[in-house]
Amino acid sequence: IAGGRLQLGISRGSPEQVIDGFRYFSYVPPEGITDAEMARHHTEVFLELLLGKGFAKPNPSPMFPNPPGLLRLEPYSEGLRERIWWGAGTNATAQWAAKLGMNLQSSTLKIDESGKPFHIQQAEQIRLYRAAWKEAGHARTPRVSVSRSIFALTDDRDRMYFARGDEEG
């Protein structure tokens, strides 16, 4: 797909926007499992399927001919598994992403885990990610991106909420 240029960013989603947003997609975590654990499990399954191995039994009466054997995820993109970026909101999920060989996408959605200034926490998240990557023994170099959400102020209400004019706003 796209000549090997496709980069895919995924995460469990920003938790503050919708209460139990996963339910709107018919996902309900089993008893004793959090929505975050469910999302990580689904991600692990997805990563395995990206390797291109057959997993699904073909329909004996398909609309068009199938290749022999189990069917893989299509369209298949060689190397896409190495071009997956995990949007980590915590240090623990950054380390988890590193262990699984995903690239790290850090942003302003990082959760405050220590009360330290944001830039200190984000730098620590990246250090922990790189250490976990090294410990996992991956052959390739880890990739990290840092993004920041920017919102245009278009009216007086926006300015009232977001244009405080100090270092905090």
What is each model feature region?
Residues 63-72:
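Active-site glycine-rich loop that binds ribose-phosphate moieties when present
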Residues 46, 97, 129:
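Conserved, mostly hydrophobic/aromatic
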Residues 92-120:
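A conserved active-site cap/scaffold subdomain adjacent to cofactor or substrate pockets
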